[in-house]
Amino acid sequence: AGVSYCATCDGAFFKDKTVAVIGGGDVALEDALYLANVCRRVYLIHRRNELRGTKVLQAQVFENEKITFLGESEVMEILGDKQVTGIAVHHKASDETKRIALDGVFIAVGMEPQSALYEPLMNLEHGYVPAEEDCATKRAGLYVAGDVRTKRLRQIVTAVSDGANAVCSITEYLTTNDKEGRLGKPC
């Protein structure tokens, strides 16, 4: 216990504790900022010296006294038997490995939207496809669902919800544009 992939889901379990967030993109920065409101201390660990998240989020992270950034670093080991007690972090530039005592690890890596399919069709917003809650894009008949869509929260439950909304919206679109009357009623 102590390893999580969702700061908003599990952050409350670490109230007033020390945690690490692994990653350097927007999700990692958002997680670190969220956890800084709950936890005593947050380590943000990234394999590069520069973060990849938006400049606005980077500024907020660096201004937050509860967040310590460890760049050019990789987590080599999560310590503890049944509960996380710390991590071993290797700093690439100095070639040193140190142990940090902490209570939880939040993994926020590899969360870039797979939106290349949409690039020729529309302008993306930071790599995400702009769409409202009904999952409709600005192009008639083109819908998007899941974490590739612009939205506030990216979790499995919201991706599944997007799928249901998209199906309902697509059905409505198809039946509205069904000139021959072959389709049934919309949702």
Where would I find each of the regions flagged by the language model?
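A Rossmann-like FAD-binding core segment of flavoenzymes
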Residues: 36-133, 172-187
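N-terminal Rossmann-fold NAD(P) dinucleotide-binding loop
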Residues: 28-29
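Generic hydrophobic/aromatic pocket-lining and core-packing "Φ" positions
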Residues: 32-33
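Residues that mark the start of a beta-strand
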Residues: 17-18
